[in-house]
Amino acid sequence: MSKDLVHPSLIRAGIVELEMAEETTDLINRTIESNQAHLQGEPLYVDSLPEDMSRLRIEDKSRRTKTEEEERDEGSSEEDNYLSEGQDPLIPFQNFLDEIGARAVKRLKTGEGFFRVWSALSDDIKGYVSTNIMTSGERDTKSIQIQTEPTASVSSGNESRHDSESMHDPNDKKDHTPDHDVVPDIESSTDKGEIRDIEGEVAHQVAESFSKKYKFPSRSSGIFLWNFEQLKMNLDDIVKAAMNVPGVERIAEKGGKLPLRCILGFVALDSSKRFRLLADNDKVARLIQEDINSYMARLEEAE
């Protein structure tokens, strides 16, 4: 047999490539036709148009009548209560949040504490909301108070008469007790704010060392490495568990450096089966206690 013969598999491969090329060309032609569909009509020559064509306007009479009727029905007082898209207060507020967020990230990258950055950030947001967003609401409340002042004065006069008549009754002393119920609410709100700030400081320090590996004693009288990523937990869950470590809340409140190896070992012993299998639990417990004692001693020396 001659060596110039072509193998049948090569012929089949060439036929397949030809078919694919034909399909590709058909697809390209269809795409070109669809993109040039607006050019398939009769051409319009600008020179053939009349001179006054630029002054002509095409209007829909039915739509125009509907809009005119709607404009007549709506009063000017109702139009003042609605803002157009250009006057939406949320757009500049979003821009403000983006700006201060970028500044906060820069401050955190420079090494500034999370507690200080967050307190300054919250003050800026409160100031912006009180000056730019709450102004319209305050105007509405002032107008309502001015309108209701006469009726309020009459009702207050009647109430003063009733109080003067009932002052001599000893059973009415309960009604004149001072409003001390407001104080616990304020204290609880401040306590919640402080707890959120402390948790934020813990989350910041844990997130910075999320992939850093720490040494722990193993069962084989050696050591092994472990980090927060191997816990397979959310940052919020890690922070909640870390708040149970003695002394962590106090150190975070003072803005000091947290015992991260102690926190990692405490959370891992509580939530990771693999860590408990690898680690010598007694030695890890002693290691946690030693870290707590050393960090608390440093905090007392700093105070």
Swiss-Prot record:
| Molecular function in Gene Ontology | RNA-directed RNA polymerase activity
Where Phosphoserine occurs along the chain?
211, 272
- Is Oxidoreductase found in the keyword set? no
Q: Does the keyword Chaperone apply?
A: yes
Q: What are the boundaries of the region Disordered?
A: 50-87, 139-194
From the record, give the cysteines joined by S-S bonds: none
Q: Where is the composition biased (Basic and acidic residues)?
A: 52-69, 159-194
Highest taxon above the source species: Viruses
User: What's one GO-annotated cellular component?
Assistant: virion component
Maturation and modification = Phosphorylated by host PKC and by an unknown kinase.
BP term (GO), one: symbiont-mediated suppression of host JAK-STAT cascade via inhibition of STAT2 activity
Acidic residues: bias regions: 70-82
Instruction: Provide this UniProt record's keywords sorted from A to Z.
Output: Chaperone, Host cytoplasm, Host nucleus, Host-virus interaction, Inhibition of host innate immune response by virus, Inhibition of host interferon signaling pathway by virus, Inhibition of host STAT1 by virus, Inhibition of host STAT2 by virus, Interferon antiviral system evasion, Phosphoprotein, Viral immunoevasion, Viral RNA replication, Virion
Where is the short sequence motif Nuclear localization signal located? 212-215
Q: Where is the composition biased (Polar residues)?
A: 143-158
- UniProt motif (Nuclear export signal) ranges: 49-58
SUBUNIT field:
Homotrimer when phosphorylated. This trimer is stabilized by binding to the L protein. Binds soluble protein N, and ribonucleocapsid. Interacts with host STAT1, STAT2 and PML.
Biological role stated in the UniProt entry: Non catalytic polymerase cofactor and regulatory protein that plays a role in viral transcription and replication. Stabilizes the RNA polymerase L to the N-RNA template and binds the soluble protein N, preventing it from encapsidating non-genomic RNA. Also inhibits host IFN-alpha and IFN-beta signaling by binding and retaining phosphorylated STAT1 in the cytoplasm or by inhibiting the DNA binding of STAT1 in the nucleus.
Could you say which protein family the record assigns here?
A: Belongs to the lyssavirus protein P family.
What name does the UniProt record give this protein?
A: Phosphoprotein
